[in-house]
Amino acid sequence: MALRELEFTSHNGTDTIQAWVYEPAVTPVAVVQLIHGLGEHSRRYLHMTAALVDAGFVVVADDHAGHGRTAMQSGTWGDAGDESATVIVQDEVTLYRKAKELFPDLPYVVFGHSLGSMIARALVLQPGVEVDGLALGGIAVGMRGVESTLDREALKAAVAADGSAPAADALVGQLFDGFLDRFAAARARGFEAVEYLFPYAFPAC
């Protein structure tokens, strides 16, 4: 396996996106653009990347603005800037274009997990983006129960604020209500692995 490191300026104009190209030792059969989820980074998928490369695929992946090595370099965590959804999608468009320049004749597949599945769906709808396959995992569609649990007035106030202060823990808890229930239940039953992993469970989104 050969590894290339790429950098490019984020759509937000401030971050330098860190990206990687993993190439097989054999003639490649296709490119897979891997898009990670909320609060994680692309190297969380190294086991999947290794399996794909062993099967002859090129894998391209980056760490979103506010995530992973990109955030380590900028010092800004969890914040892609104004219009963050647009920023992250356009950064994936940039990575797509760079990959197509490197491998113009190979079939192209996009894979996204959780938030990455939402980004992947937006990516393939962008002008000039043509793919041969779309694979989605941990598909995020809506937030279960948010209609009844969310304090909408508190959310409006948080959105209207200048953004210098983080959202209240209670509000964040309402937004992600139910996401960790299965971990909490297993922890209560004394599962040691879950006890160890529980502090890191949230990045699995």
What are these regions (language model features)?
Residues M1-V26:
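N-terminal cap/lid segment of alpha/beta-hydrolase-fold proteins
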Residues S117-G128:
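Short glycine-enriched nucleophile-adjacent loop
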Residues G37-E40:
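Active-site glycine-rich loops that stabilize anionic/oxyanionic intermediates
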Residues L125, G133-G163:
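Flexible "cap/lid" loop of the alpha/beta hydrolase fold
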Residues A157-C205:
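Alpha/beta-hydrolase
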Residues S42, T49-G75:
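Conserved alpha/beta-hydrolase
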Residues G81-K100:
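Alpha/beta-hydrolase active-site loop
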Residues F103-S114:
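Alpha/beta-hydrolase fold nucleophile elbow
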